[in-house]
Amino acid sequence: AECMIDIADAAGLPSYLKPKGEKLLREKPLMKQMFQELGIASPRYKKIRLDTLEEDFADMAFPCVIKPVNGYGSHGVFVANAIEDVRERFQSTAAQSTFDYLMAEEYNDGREFNIMTWIVDGQAHIISIADREKIAFEDGEIPQVVRCAYPSPLTAELQDEAASIATKIAGYVGLENGPLCVQAFYREGEGLAVCEAAGRIFGYEHELVTLGSGLSVEELLIDCVYDQPAAKERVLAHSPLFANHAAGLYFHGHDGEVADTSSIDELGALPGVVEYRPYYRTGDTISHERGAKPYVVRYYVAGPSRESVDSLSRTIMGRASVLDPDGNELLLRTAPMAH
């Protein structure tokens, strides 16, 4: 989104957001300052520098999530349990950004949600609220997303609060019509605490909106460019309380050569699996270098109820396997989180 917005602005082409507004959604210190000014709850954070770590963490509670200021995705992000963890990995994380300092954010262990909204004439309308389920595979590493389930059972309860938050953010960044997504945490009795916001649609998930509700995000984006009235009509007619249920299952792996994918191929043929995509085949090498494939394998599943989707998810997560030439398991083991 950032590159598209910059190119559109330089070329004098219309776009739903200007670079100044996008910068507020890309640079984490500016984003956190925005949340503070808008009165939006967010995990406590600090700018941290290598030569002042003791002072910077004086009033912070561990564990903390350490992030580059304007990195992409989860590159360089890690969980620190002590100042020594930060000192050890400071330089490698700073290398993922154009800034020489990092962001430390107190870890929130509440339920996590991916919230898609579409702004229409300055007002946010909820497209979807999904459960974002994660697992930490190694100490010190950030939990990885293993499943996103649509819609969350808490959608009806949270949609008004989520829309209010997104409307405030849209107004601050100058977004009148277009996509705005939010990642947020929730603890009962505390409301939503926003982690991040982005002026785009979540990757590897928009298909789940279509499976659950019938709304085509691709057509909505096209209408946003060529037929704004039609885009508004689509959004205003949409309900985040989907008629059907869907989930994306995302499998991560160890580095290594792939020899046997027969298990994941068989699971891809199960009833209820709508789309199955292996990113690696026999002879390929799983890697985590920059630019590597995002997952080892991905499944989209759908069903008439959350129970049916959960059951199929458990089956796939329990049986999926990718082996190396010596018969060793390459997949990191996953299981759906219980709520």
Identify the function of each model-found stretch.
Residues 31-36:
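Structural element of the ATP-grasp superfamily
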